[in-house]
């Protein structure tokens, strides 16, 4: 038992997929961003920029530990990379991610043009194609590095 981690850049469709999959499988679904936002008393999705990623990762680890007490297995959607100011990809610490009880990793991908449309529709924000392409590349690279380092299967 453990966490089935579904990764991918912003707007790729992680939450949309997992809402449906959770309903079908009866396996609960949580969003890393939502767990952090609830703890920080922020409105989820309001701000994509992270000021203190190390603190947020510590919060996420704590929230995951709490969830595992009630749910021995669940889906978690999240990221290996986030944007910092200026829409520059920022890699999350792999040592923190290694503490999150992942049993499997699924990396979702979509065409950058589709991701741009999804983000415009969902968040009302315009990102440059170059920034989304850079985020996708960083996310994919980190997913593979993490999987190799931890021997957690990546699909």
Residue ranges with predicted function:
Residues 3:
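Walker A (P-loop) ATP-phosphate-binding motif of ABC ATPase nucleotide-binding domains
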Residues 14:
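Conserved lysine of the Walker
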Residues 6:
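Hydrophobic anchor at the beta1->P-loop junction of P-loop NTPases
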Residues 11:
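Walker A (P-loop) phosphate-binding loop of P-loop NTPases
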Residues 44-84:
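Conserved nucleotide-sensing/catalytic segment adjacent to the nucleotide-binding pocket
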Residues 121, 125-155:
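Small-molecule kinase domains that catalyze NTP-dependent phosphoryl transfer to phosphate-bearing small molecules
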Residues 79-122:
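ATP-dependent NMP and nucleoside kinases share a basic, alpha-helical "lid"
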Residues 19-60:
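Conserved substrate/cofactor phosphate-moiety recognition/catalytic segment
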């Amino acid at each position: 038992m453990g966490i089935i981690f579904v990764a991918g850049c912003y707007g790729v469709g992680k939450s949309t997929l997992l809402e449906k999959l959770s309903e079908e499988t009866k396996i609960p679904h949580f969003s890393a961003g939502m767990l952090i936002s609830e703890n920080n008393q922020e409105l989820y999705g309001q701000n994509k920029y992270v000021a203190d990623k190390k603190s947020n990762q510590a919060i996420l680890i704590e929230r995951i530990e709490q969830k595992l007490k009630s749910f021995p297995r669940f889906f978690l959607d999240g990221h290996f990379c986030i944007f910092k100011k200026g829409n520059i990809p920022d890699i999350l610490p792999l040592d923190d991610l290694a503490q999150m009880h992942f049993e499997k990793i699924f990396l979702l991908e979509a065409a950058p043009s589709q991701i741009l449309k999804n983000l415009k529709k969902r968040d009302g924000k315009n990102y440059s194609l170059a920034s989304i392409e850079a985020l996708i590349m960083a996310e994919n690279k980190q997913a593979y590095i993490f999987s190799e380092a931890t021997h957690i299967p990546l699909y």
